[in-house]
C-alpha cells in the first residue's frame, strides 16, 4: 500500500471512530453519589434604601418587621408612625452546595412579598437562612442587583425586566457545615440522572474493568452500588475522583418532545419510523367586511343615509403533496421528507402526533 492510500485509510478509520468516541461521557456528568447534593435554604428579610418604591401602608407585616428590628437595636418607636415606602418585605432563597465550609459564600435570590413596585437600589438587611431542619446554615446581607427599573406617574409607567426580584452575588456567608456523607464509608451508591437499565449496566462494567474487581453491581436502573476496593481503603476521595473520570456511552430511549405553545420540536437520535405515507395541505378562509354608505340624491327631501354591509369571502387550499417514509427511516429522513412538503414547525407537531396515532412511530411522544 503506497503512502497516499495509507493516509486515506487512516483518515477513514479516524472518521469512523470519532463518532463513537464523541458519544462517550464521563460518569460524573450522568450520575451523582447518594447524599452529595445541594440543599435549599430560605429566610425572611427586609430590603431598605428604596426610593419610594417599597411596600405601601396597606401591607402590615413590613411595619411589624421593621419595628422588631429597631427594638432589637434598642430603639423604641410607635408602629403607627412607621412609613414603609423605602422598605420592602422579601423572601430570600439560596442553594447550599455540598461540602461547603464555614466562611464560604453563596449567591442568594430575593423576591418581594408585598406590593413593592421595585427593589432596585435596595440593600438586604442581615437575614438568617434556614434549612428544612430549621437550623440556620447561612446569613445573607448586601446590595441587590435587579438589572431592571420601574418609573411612572399617574398616567404612564416605564418598566424594564422584572424589578421586584433580584440576586446578591456571594451575598450569603455559610455559618454551619453539612455532614460529610462520604467519610468512613465502605460502600457508595451512584444515582443516575436518567435511570436506564443499559446505562447502569455499562457503568458497573466500566468500574469493574477499571479496578479489576467485582466492586460494582446494579440493583435497579436508577443506581449502581459500589464497594470500596481494598487498595482504596481510607482514600474515598481519591477513589471517587478516579471513578468519575471513567467514560461510558449512555443509552438514550427514543423520544420526541413537542411544545405546542412555542412550536418547539426535539427529536431524539434513536427515533425510527415504520413505512407510512404523509400528506399535508392547508385550507385558508378569508372573510373581509367592507361596509358601504348609501346616501339619498342631493336636494332630495326623502330618503336617509344608511350603511350597507358587504362581505367578501375567499377560500384557498394549497395543494398537498404526499411523502412516503420507508420502514426504519431515521430522523434525518423524516426531516428531509417533511421539509419537501413545506411544513412549518407547528404543522410538524400535528403530523408527528398523527404518525404516532397510526402506530408508525417507534418512540415515546411527550407533549409539554
UniProtKB/Swiss-Prot annotation:
Subcellular location per the Swiss-Prot or TrEMBL entry: Periplasm; Bacterial flagellum basal body
Species assigned in the record: Geobacter sulfurreducens (strain ATCC 51573 / DSM 12127 / PCA)
One of the protein's GO biological processes: bacterial-type flagellum-dependent cell motility
Primary location recorded for the protein, binned into one broad class: periplasm
Gene it is expressed from: flgI
Pfam families assigned to the protein according to its UniProt record, in alphabetical order: FlgI (PF02119)
Family: Belongs to the FlgI family.
Keywords: Bacterial flagellum, Periplasm, Signal
InterPro entries documented for this protein: Flag_FlgI
HAMAP family: FlgI (MF_00416)
MF-aspect GO terms: structural molecule activity
Role, per record: Assembles around the rod to form the L-ring and probably protects the motor/basal body from shearing forces during rotation.
NCBIfam families on file: PRK05303.1
Protein name, entry field: Flagellar P-ring protein
GO cellular component, one term: bacterial-type flagellum basal body, distal rod, P ring
Subunit structure: The basal body constitutes a major portion of the flagellar organelle and consists of four rings (L,P,S, and M) mounted on a central rod.
Signal peptide: 1-24
